[in-house]
Amino acid sequence: MLFNINEKGEPLVISFAPFLSPEAIKYLQENERCSDQSQKRTAQQIEAIYTSGQNILVSASAGSGKTFVMVERILDKILRGVSIDRLFISTFTVKAATELRERIENKLYSQIAQTTDFQMKVYLTEQLQSLCQADIGTMDAFAQKVVSRYGYSIGISSQFRIMQDKAEQDVLKQEVFSKLFSEFMNQKEAPVFRALVKNFSGNCKDTSAFRELVYTCYSFSQSTENPKIWLQENFLSAAKTYQRLEDIPDHDIELLLLAMQDTANQLRDVTDMEDYGQLTKAGSRSAKYTKHLTIIEKLSDWVRDFKCLYGKAGLDRLIRDVTGLIPSGNDVTVSKVKYPVFKTLHQKLKQFRHLETILMYQKDCFPLLEQLQDFVLAFSEAYLAVKIQESAFEFSDIAHFAIKILEENTDIRQSYQQHYHEVMVDEYQDNNHMQERLLTLLSNGHNRFMVGDIKQSIYRFRQADPQIFNQKFRDYQKKTEQGKVILLKENFRSQSEVLNVSNAVFSHLMDESVGDALYDEQHQLIAGSHAQTVPYLDRRAQLLLYNSDKDDGNAPSDSEGISFSEVTIVAKEIIKLHNDKGVPFEDITLLVSSRTRNDIISHTFNQYGIPIVTDGGQQNYLKSVEVMVMLDTLRTINNPRNDYALVALLRSPMFAFDEDDLARIALQKDNELDKDCLYDKIQRAVIGRGAHPELIHDTLLGKLNIFLKTLKSWRRYAKLGSLYDLIWKIFNDRFYFDFVASQAKAEQAQANLYALALRANQFEKSGYKGLYRFIKMIDKVLETQNDLADVEVAAPKQAVNLMTIHKSKGLQFPYVFILNCDKRFSMTDIHKSFILNRQHGIGIKYLADIKGLLGETTLNSVKVSMETLPYQLNKQELRLATLSEQMRLLYVAMTRAEKKVYFIGKASKSKSQDITDPKKLGKLLSLALREQLLTFQDWLLAIADIFSTEDLYFDVRFIEDSDLTQESVGRLQTPQLLNPDDLKDNRQSETIARALDMLEAVSQLNANYEAAIHLPTVRTPSQLKVTYEPLLEPIGVDIIEKSSRSLSDFTLPHFSKKAKVEASHIGSALHQLMQVLPLSKPINQQTLLDALRGIDSNEEVKTALDLKKIESFFCDTSLGQFFQTYQKHLYREAPFAILKLDPISQEEYVLRGIIDAYFLFDDHIVLVDYKTDKYKQPIELKKRYQQQLELYAEALTQTYKLPVTKRYLVLMGGGKPEIVEV
């Protein structure tokens, strides 16, 4: 019951319906089942929405509508009188929180519109107003609220900021680490500490490996509910526990004995095969059979009588006996088929071998571990102290502060527990122990609602622990008084082709050992509607493998990057989908394991004209060319005597010094000085006092004067202005921001430069001032091998999506391609020198000196790296955890698809053979085989081979090179009658494009001030040509008339003919060829053909180029011969930018363009421009392009301070090349 006040001040009483009883819920489920609604809620969804008064764990499979359930449950709570601000709702991301809030808002609006009860309308309106203040967000956001409000109770100021930039964190960490390292090196136990550092770094001077160890231990501890207690009590847990053979866990010994018995059973099965050959021709037992029977009997006896024969104390003896008994190989061959009978046992023996020796030396490493524990504890405290001093914290710090506040202040904790009616959490499978502790403190013990899917837990690298979900699942199933488990199995996203293949694959792969969940009936996907079950034969899943038998590179299947052939397979399938089925590009998504090494995808797709967008977020910002140029510019301003930065700045497009210029400058040294920096040489070159002043010609001297004048102004400004203003001054002074707009990926490049200015501004606002400190911070980021995220730019909507599997979680796409299925899982962590585990603590590889054991006397020491017992335990658990997460990644990837899923990989067809698995457990592949297979592709092929008699709902196809030719792949169909890119791509058609633009704006140009408003910041020479010549001169009209078509011109297409090559493409190809053509060789057909291979055009365009005409230009014209004679003076395809004044608006703007060719001499310049326009009389083109060449000449004169004495047009659009002097 809720009270509101009406306009007269009288109380309004709202009576809310009570929460539903179990019987009422069953009644509602039955009504829903019998209803005639087109989309019905499932019985489990109804149960999840309306069950109350107890803890609830909802296990929601992919596409089962978990967000719908959460929204409906929240709305039901509100309608039953629970205010939205009394619900705690945790989401995994800020984006998810925003979407959930929007859905609740829409539901409330809908409910307000439907209700006729005035009092209810008022109440729902209040809920709508309270929605923005409700606790709907991430755990990090909530922790910040708690600390901001109650931080005073633990001595933390409410005025803090979050250090979201990893680079800033690493800079502070490095300072703390260096100081602490010096202290430990000078303490009483310094010898032990030095031994610790050497164990990981090899020597005390190189501390990088030891620093990584400390940082990793610190980060790992931060994911626990109490880092200090974990470091004190759990960090050395395994090191203290496992010191003798008797300490080895019973579970590990059971696994060894199980492997022995399995090997005996498997060997017996093999010997019982008909073709095995138990008897010789004489009828006696064969030697092989006798040997195998001995192995079977002894293994069985040793397993049965382990305790009396060996026991834990005699484990090393058992290992020696078994090693001596079984053969060194893994396989037993029967009828040319190899059965890996001994493989698993060999792996187990390797794990236990040398145990006695390891345990003997393991005790020596314990003092080192105690030193490490002390150092990490001291580092944690010192790092936190620095952050408290700066009042800047990481998210994990804030979460721990929040936990401490709630644990130490009973009244604060109880106020939250009494306030929240329910504590709800989404994506529960991705929680870590710190977050779990916080949720426990907020709950009253019986009001938690948790939604997740163990099969989609893929954030172990963020210390998420799927066992939190698993433990709750088991506890609630065993002890129903603790809570209730509700399974949402119906999938409303995917067609049966996707559901069937997902069920088929994971029913053979996933169990609690690998995957952390048994993929049985509880977890299998079920179609949620009849429409999803309608079969489509063409949507059957495909495993497409490039046959690498003829792969010249012989690249291994575990190579990191995807191959060109694999990408071509994808392109072929996409072209087929787009052309034959009309599938829009935006319906197709490519999923990859990581963001790195995917450039070949974009490059190949560009070749085939397939638009593609990536999910961004790559950590390559500081490595982008434009940012590196600017950073070197700033380094030079800070210290001109930094030769590396200075050379980079001189060579950059801002000043464009070439190798010859730099060589001339480098020779201007002072013979009296041993060391001479480049900046000093530049200054001597300018005043003519270098060692070889005759090498500094007037043009170079002019460039040097401009450079020194510009640098001087920048250095002066750096002392007075802000970093932000300095960066923009550099952009404006040298037009670098405009220059990158003419380069590849211009939008991204400009966004990166803009972000550099913003980040510099943010740096100064955070309390750091000055160019020197900014450069120092950037260099420290690079030293720690970190980077900053690229800036995201707006992406086209109609394009294929390329994203990581992690980024795709929660999304859905009609067609999904899972790429690089042959990429090996990253097992880097299990080979490190240390492995951390929440229960066992740290396990390390110990560098032991076994000189005494070997009786060695001549050598000072004999060092061997030993895997200590804690390390081995952690390694095995980590291996299974890694494989489990990879399996869940595959599940997430496959269940993103709505209609069809493709697997793309690479394998050798000739080397592939049938995979056998005699130890498979019913439907499951054996644990040994699943541990052995290390790619998605391996899993799929193993299932296809071993369960070949089943319908697995996917086909395996090998793709040959002959299937990937240009003709086989095909080309995209373009439905437009006219190519919309014609005007854009044709360098000679800018006149028409600009004229059409001006026709639309002609009325506005009549106003005096409109000219300034519409003046572009940047123009091209072609645009200017249009501005000042008659708008519709006869030539322009003639071109437009020729481009139009009448019905009488229309003819039926002749499909046997090839598509006509566009004139614009030929023009572009000609310019490329003229740019790359080597003029040092005689120009003939062979030279032209060789150069033609290096240009970026398709074969049709290359074939359409008239090479004889180009050869004639160089051989038969004086200008062509001039090119070859003075090639050292020639500059080709040179970009430029100059400042111009608009005559109408009197506003300045930047003029930029690309000059085809010019010859730079000591006292003059010769300008050349190629044109491919069709013409009747050369005089037509001379008039048309006269002003454009004048602009080019003006740009060259401004740059070099030299006159342009000759201007030539090379006309290639006629029957033969013609030269026109303008």
Curated annotation (Swiss-Prot):
<comment type="subunit">
    <text>Heterodimer of AddA and AddB/RexB.</text>
</comment>
<keyword id="KW-0269">Exonuclease</keyword>
<dbReference type="InterPro" id="IPR011604">
    <property type="entry name" value="PDDEXK-like_dom_sf"/>
</dbReference>
<keyword id="KW-0378">Hydrolase</keyword>
<keyword id="KW-0347">Helicase</keyword>
<protein>
    <recommendedName>
        <fullName>ATP-dependent helicase/nuclease subunit A</fullName>
        <ecNumber>3.1.-.-</ecNumber>
        <ecNumber>5.6.2.4</ecNumber>
    </recommendedName>
</protein>
<keyword id="KW-0067">ATP-binding</keyword>
<dbReference type="GO" id="GO:0003690">
    <property type="term" value="F:double-stranded DNA binding"/>
</dbReference>
<dbReference type="Pfam" id="PF13361">
    <property type="entry name" value="UvrD_C"/>
</dbReference>
<dbReference type="GO" id="GO:0033202">
    <property type="term" value="C:DNA helicase complex"/>
</dbReference>
<dbReference type="InterPro" id="IPR011335">
    <property type="entry name" value="Restrct_endonuc-II-like"/>
</dbReference>
<dbReference type="Pfam" id="PF00580">
    <property type="entry name" value="UvrD-helicase"/>
</dbReference>
<dbReference type="InterPro" id="IPR038726">
    <property type="entry name" value="PDDEXK_AddAB-type"/>
</dbReference>
<dbReference type="InterPro" id="IPR027417">
    <property type="entry name" value="P-loop_NTPase"/>
</dbReference>
<dbReference type="GO" id="GO:0000724">
    <property type="term" value="P:double-strand break repair via homologous recombination"/>
</dbReference>
<keyword id="KW-0234">DNA repair</keyword>
<dbReference type="InterPro" id="IPR014152">
    <property type="entry name" value="AddA"/>
</dbReference>
<keyword id="KW-0547">Nucleotide-binding</keyword>
<comment type="function">
    <text>The heterodimer acts as both an ATP-dependent DNA helicase and an ATP-dependent, dual-direction single-stranded exonuclease. Recognizes the chi site generating a DNA molecule suitable for the initiation of homologous recombination. The AddA nuclease domain is required for chi fragment generation; this subunit has the helicase and 3' -&gt; 5' nuclease activities.</text>
</comment>
<keyword id="KW-0540">Nuclease</keyword>
<keyword id="KW-0413">Isomerase</keyword>
<dbReference type="Pfam" id="PF12705">
    <property type="entry name" value="PDDEXK_1"/>
</dbReference>
<feature type="domain" description="UvrD-like helicase C-terminal">
    <location>
        <begin position="524"/>
        <end position="810"/>
    </location>
</feature>
<feature type="binding site">
    <location>
        <begin position="60"/>
        <end position="67"/>
    </location>
    <ligand>
        <name>ATP</name>
    </ligand>
</feature>
<dbReference type="InterPro" id="IPR014016">
    <property type="entry name" value="UvrD-like_ATP-bd"/>
</dbReference>
<dbReference type="GO" id="GO:0043138">
    <property type="term" value="F:3'-5' DNA helicase activity"/>
</dbReference>
<keyword id="KW-0227">DNA damage</keyword>
<dbReference type="GO" id="GO:0005524">
    <property type="term" value="F:ATP binding"/>
</dbReference>
<dbReference type="GO" id="GO:0005829">
    <property type="term" value="C:cytosol"/>
</dbReference>
<dbReference type="InterPro" id="IPR000212">
    <property type="entry name" value="DNA_helicase_UvrD/REP"/>
</dbReference>
<dbReference type="InterPro" id="IPR014017">
    <property type="entry name" value="DNA_helicase_UvrD-like_C"/>
</dbReference>
<comment type="similarity">
    <text>Belongs to the helicase family. AddA subfamily.</text>
</comment>
<dbReference type="GO" id="GO:0008408">
    <property type="term" value="F:3'-5' exonuclease activity"/>
</dbReference>
<keyword id="KW-0238">DNA-binding</keyword>
<dbReference type="GO" id="GO:0016887">
    <property type="term" value="F:ATP hydrolysis activity"/>
</dbReference>
<feature type="domain" description="UvrD-like helicase ATP-binding">
    <location>
        <begin position="39"/>
        <end position="495"/>
    </location>
</feature>
